[in-house]
Amino acid sequence: MGLPWYRVHTVVLNDPGRLLSVHIMHTALVAGWAGSMALYELAVFDPSDPVLDPMWRQGMFVIPFMTRLGITNSWGGWNITGGTITNPGLWSYEGVAGAHIVFSGLCFLAAIWHWVYWDLEIFCDERTGKPSLDLPKIFGIHLFLSGVACFGFGAFHVTGLYGPGIWVSDPYGLTGKVQPVNPAWGVEGFDPFVPGGIASHHIAAGTLGILAGLFHLSVRPPQRLYKGLRMGNIETVLSSSIAAVFFAAFVVAGTMWYGSATTPIELFGPTRYQWDQGYFQQEIYRRVSAGLAENQSLSDAWSKIPEKLAFYDYIGNNPAKGGLFRAGSMDNGDGIAVGWLGHPVFRNKEGRELFVRRMPTFFETFPVVLVDGDGIVRADVPFRRAESKYSVEQVGVTVEFYGGELNGVSYSDPATVKKYARRAQLGEIFELDRATLKSDGVFRSSPRGWFTFGHASFALLFFFGHIWHGARTLFRDVFAGIDPDLDAQVEFGAFQKLGDPTTKRQAV
């Protein structure tokens, strides 16, 4: 039968064996992609500098997901935190990738088997001898099994009872490591940034899923509900499954973009809101102030700031700075970070400390403006020199570095001062290597941005798919143009499965 491309899925209508086959093949493709992508990323990943060139700067997409579940070692002899290891064990990055590829191959073979041997006794209704599926019972089985998996993940893997735990870090992404997590059963478990909520919610949701699965296995739906929701139609299953998937996609798009315990910044990069709110800048200033309160010099206080913390406070790591259609990793944009030059402190000729106004997220260019502690503009880099009153030359601005590679170095010549003022707009100043990757200097987004964009886009698409298939299954008789109580042959829409005379609509 000459099916148009958009109707090819009708071949698995009323064919449970081949419906199962195509789903197994889909699982094979997903697992095969995951394993292959992991091997590709491992081939190009450079683990040598986890501070200034972490996985998210290199555009790694699947490695962060493996890492947050407890995989940290490679058969290449390296650890994700920068150390070396001698016995990575089976469950290394390569081991997980290989397991996915082996699983993919087995699913591929199983899909072929089920395609060839499609007419199995298990799919036949013993009363009619025709293929049929007990969809409410299948729903109960799936709910029960997914509940067991959910409960097992929360109770064993996350807690470390049987498993490694998950990636846990401090609020500033400095001390992250894989460790067991105790369930948080109090109100704190509802805080999206508390790792204990991951364990407790999986245990609770898994328990609910197990109980709900047993309920649906032991209780039949009422006839009115069964007919009203078209529970005997496979397209109802499709519609409700799409609903579950698009809802999950919207949720994870949110937890990724806004940040949560499930998306640590060490693995996925910072969020845009941490730049917008000066999150890392405030912590850096708090640490410097604490150092000064302990009678440390300004130089010593800034020298104690971890390079990792300073690097987060750089606009090039903001996922909202990269355009959605700029291909490549962050390293392909502004370059590979080599070192922190230090914190520049600007002063005018009266000795008043000046602060460069930082570039907001959605600006490509921004005027260089220096304000004092009260927010009053004291200096700038003017667009029109003839009308300038606050130029660096007129105000006599100097810059001195504290911490980093230029610790203790000061500059007073206007050209150099303006250069560092422009760079200070972008947060802490880093030396960036653009030669190695031929980086073009245009900011890129991090995997956090790609994941969010992809999942939000597909969630919207799947939302419309849910509406489409839900409407089709609920109003099938209307769309087919057939009175459900009519069993006479009708030309238009007579066959549920196109070209198949065995599926002529019967009166119920």
UniProtKB/Swiss-Prot annotation:
Record localization: Plastid, Chloroplast thylakoid membrane
Gene label: psbB
Organism of origin: Olimarabidopsis pumila (Dwarf rocket)
Sorted UniProt keywords: Chlorophyll, Chloroplast, Chromophore, Membrane, Photosynthesis, Photosystem II, Plastid, Thylakoid, Transmembrane, Transmembrane helix
Role this protein plays: One of the components of the core complex of photosystem II (PSII). It binds chlorophyll and helps catalyze the primary light-induced photochemical processes of PSII. PSII is a light-driven water:plastoquinone oxidoreductase, using light energy to abstract electrons from H(2)O, generating O(2) and a proton gradient subsequently used for ATP formation.
Organism phylogeny: Eukaryota, Viridiplantae, Streptophyta, Embryophyta, Tracheophyta
GO annotation, biological process: photosynthetic electron transport in photosystem II
Binding partners and assembly: PSII is composed of 1 copy each of membrane proteins PsbA, PsbB, PsbC, PsbD, PsbE, PsbF, PsbH, PsbI, PsbJ, PsbK, PsbL, PsbM, PsbT, PsbX, PsbY, PsbZ, Psb30/Ycf12, at least 3 peripheral proteins of the oxygen-evolving complex and a large number of cofactors. It forms dimeric complexes.
Transmembrane segments: 21-36, 101-115, 140-156, 203-218, 237-252, 457-472
InterPro entries assigned to the protein according to its UniProt record, in alphabetical order: PS_antenna-like, PS_II_antenna-like_sf, PSII_PsbB
Keyword field contains Thylakoid: yes
One annotated Gene Ontology cellular component of this protein: photosystem II
Domain of life: Eukaryota
A family per Pfam: PSII
Bilayer topology term: Multi-pass membrane protein
Principal subcellular localization: plastid
Gene Ontology MF terms: chlorophyll binding; electron transporter, transferring electrons within the cyclic electron transport pathway of photosynthesis activity
Family: Belongs to the PsbB/PsbC family. PsbB subfamily.
Cofactor-binding details, from the entry: Binds multiple chlorophylls. PSII binds additional chlorophylls, carotenoids and specific lipids.
Protein name in UniProt: Photosystem II CP47 reaction center protein
